[in-house]
């Protein structure tokens, strides 16, 4: 009987220790996905988690990334063999594009935004001013060469209890709309 209690105590200690290790596990951009902060006009805006993952999260997603990346090639929609290979080119093109659309959209002075580029998708994350013409900005951003889709994960309330994206400050909290 004492052996069983000791074993149970040891198991509980190991479980608690492993939970702590995984909670504090370092996050990094394992896939080298472009992640750009493009504006800082709203200083209270929480920084998105972006592509930063633990190694465990990265490994769990690896097969899914391969399938998603290769599907456009298999379907004949991509000139490159993997959709993720477009991301570096798109990052350069999007920098030029946002500079071009600034006079028409005034996004710099009305937002704190980050762009995450993954497999020809642009995830727009961060905060926008209530009067900001977000639809026009997203429409213009979608005109960037090789972009398949622009996904809006922005908020007008930086202090909302639930944001449409994961934050660096609280990476385990699920976004308000986790449909993507």
Language model features with spans:
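N-terminal targeting leaders
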Residues: 2-13, 20-180
């Amino acid at each position: 009987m004492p052996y069983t209690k000791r074993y149970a105590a040891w198991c509980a200690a190991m479980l608690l220790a492993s939970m702590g290790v995984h909670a504090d596990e370092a996050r990094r951009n394992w896939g080298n996905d472009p992640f750009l902060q493009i504006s800082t006009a709203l200083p209270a805006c929480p920084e998105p988690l972006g592509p930063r993952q633990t190694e465990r999260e990265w490994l769990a997603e690896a097969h899914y990334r391969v399938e998603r990346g290769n599907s456009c090639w298999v379907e004949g929609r991509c000139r490159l063999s993997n959709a993720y290979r477009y991301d570096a080119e798109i990052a350069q093109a999007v920098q030029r594009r946002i500079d071009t659309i600034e006079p028409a959209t005034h996004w710099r002075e009305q937002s704190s935004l980050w762009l995450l580029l993954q497999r020809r998708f642009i995830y727009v994350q961060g905060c926008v001013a209530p009067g900001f013409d977000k639809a026009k900005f997203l429409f213009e951003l979608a005109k960037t060469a090789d972009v398949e889709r622009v996904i809006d994960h922005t908020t007008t309330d930086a202090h909302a209890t639930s944001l449409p994206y994961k934050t660096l400050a609280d990476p385990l909290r699920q976004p308000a709309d986790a449909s993507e």
